[in-house]
Structures are given as C-alpha cells and as structure tokens.
C-alpha cells in the first residue's frame, strides 16, 4: 500500500511500513543516530558584525564588518545579506557552484525565516527552512548529515544567522525605542555561518547525531537566554560538554573564569587545553 501526502509546496511520499526496512540499527540509545556513511565537512565560512570584531573570538571570523546594515537599508535585509555572503564564500572555498548542492538547510530567528528565504532565494537550491533558535546550526547540520547518509544528497549546506537588532525587535524591544537593558540581558550575535557537507571528503566527519528534548524550567525573562540554556549543562557529563559547547567556548570560559578567580578545570573535559 502506498500513499502520498501533499505538504504545502513540497510533496512527501511514504510507503506502507512493511515495505520500509528497519532503521533501528542506526539508533544508539533514545536520541542518538549513528550514521553509517558519515558525511565530510568540505567547506565552511562565517561573518560577524562590529561587536564580534571587538570580542575575544574575532580572529576566528572569515569576515567582519563595522556596519550593522552590511550596506542595506534595514537590519532584516542585512541579515539576509550575511547569509548570502557566507554561502557564496563557502562555495568559493570548495570550488563549487550553487547547482552542485542538492539541498540547503537554513534558518534564523525571524518570523517565517525571512533572513534565510530572502537571502538564499537567488541560489535556486532546494531549501529546508528551519527554526531552532540557538540550536539552528546544530539542527541544520544534523538534517544535512542525515540527508547525505541516507543517500538522498551528495552535497548539502547547513546555514544559520542572527542579528542583534533584528532579534531585539523580534523578542524584546525595538532598538530605536531605547529600552533599558537589565543586568541579565545577553547580547545576540550579529553573525552568520555556513558549512558544506559531502558524501566524500577528507573530514572532519559527522558520525553521530543527537536530538535534544524540550526542557521548560519556567524561565520567563526574555532577556536571560543563559538561564533558558542552563539545563543542558546540568544533564551533560564533563566528557560530553565540549561536544555541545565547543573547544573555543570552553577555552574562552577558562580564560574568563580564571580572570575572575574561578575555574572549570577538572570540572569539564579540558585535557586538550593543558
């Protein structure tokens, strides 16, 4: 038995469950998938704004701008421009053309993913619009990796972006309003990143994908993003922390903590920094 589901502009084909081979051999535990054909990272690029240029991670950016509008007339258009720039840079570094990508998985923090959809429309690449807030980069990499592992794509791009001024208008107060920021307020990055995955390459490889779960601790302060994200640190063992936070962020935490008389050395997996 075969049936077809029409979902908006896309078409999803599904077959009777008896005709589909079991995927249980790919699952490890409750939320992790082991990829039998791990895709390789073949190119990546990123871009940041003025605050990022002044921050401790400035040397890790491929491109930095002191213009929060990136030559555009609105901040929303600026965010779209960032996405377009990073995808083109990643393509150029891999010596690829837009037509060489089978899919692009991208998202941002705006309604209807307008940062992604307007920024990437000229590429003409099959597009999955994602909304995972701060997890969008991980979500896009996960889905792109599974598309390639499943044999549905040879190359796919994972993209995300955020912009301080667009995020403030989306979630809190428009910047021109001049609202006073409370002590708990975080600063949303003005930045974008793109990673291109392929079914063949020198690595690094994405070998496993873990999907998180929704945790609601009742945090109602829209300014305090740190409190909303804190539960993940409680559940992680030290040896797994770097897989989520990243080596750069761990190194930065050590530097900042040491300067204030605190340390995470011995608490998290920091052997690579000794």
What are the roles of these predicted feature ranges?
Residues 41, 75-135, 242-257:
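Conserved beta-ketoacyl condensing-enzyme motif
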Residues 52-54, 115-117, 167-172, 257-260:
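Short acidic, glycine/serine/threonine-rich loops at helix termini
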Residues 112-114, 164-169, 213-218, 255:
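Short, well-ordered, mixed-charge alpha-helical segments that flank or form enzyme active sites
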């Amino acid at each position: 038995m075969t049936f077809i589901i029409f979902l908006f502009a896309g078409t999803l084909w599904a077959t009777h469950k008896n005709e589909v081979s079991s995927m249980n051999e790919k699952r490890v535990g409750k939320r992790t998938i082991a990829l039998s054909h791990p895709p390789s990272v073949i190119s990546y690029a990123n871009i940041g704004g003025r605050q990022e240029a002044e921050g401790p991670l400035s040397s890790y950016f491929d491109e930095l701008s002191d213009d929060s509008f990136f030559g555009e007339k609105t901040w929303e258009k600026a965010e779209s421009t960032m996405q377009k720039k990073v995808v083109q840079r990643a393509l150029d570094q891999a010596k690829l053309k837009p037509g060489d990508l089978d899919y692009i998985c991208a998202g941002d923090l705006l309604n209807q993913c307008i940062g992604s959809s307007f920024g990437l429309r000229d590429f003409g690449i099959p597009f999955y619009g994602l909304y995972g807030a701060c997890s969008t980069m991980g979500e896009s990499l996960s889905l792109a990796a599974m598309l390639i592992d499943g044999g549905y794509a040879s190359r796919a791009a994972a993209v995300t972006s955020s912009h301080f001024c667009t995020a403030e208008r989306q979630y809190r107060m428009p910047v021109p309003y001049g609202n006073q920021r409370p002590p708990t307020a975080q600063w949303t990055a003005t930045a974008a990143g793109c990673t291109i995955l392929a079914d063949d390459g020198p690595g690094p490889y994405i070998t496993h994908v873990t999907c998180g779960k929704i945790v609601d601790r009742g945090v109602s302060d829209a300014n305090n993003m740190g409190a909303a994200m804190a539960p993940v640190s409680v559940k992680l063992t030290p040896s797994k922390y770097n897989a989520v936070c990243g080596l750069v962020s761990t190194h930065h935490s050590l530097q900042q903590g040491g300067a204030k008389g605190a340390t995470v050395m011995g608490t998290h997996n920091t052997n690579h920094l000794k």
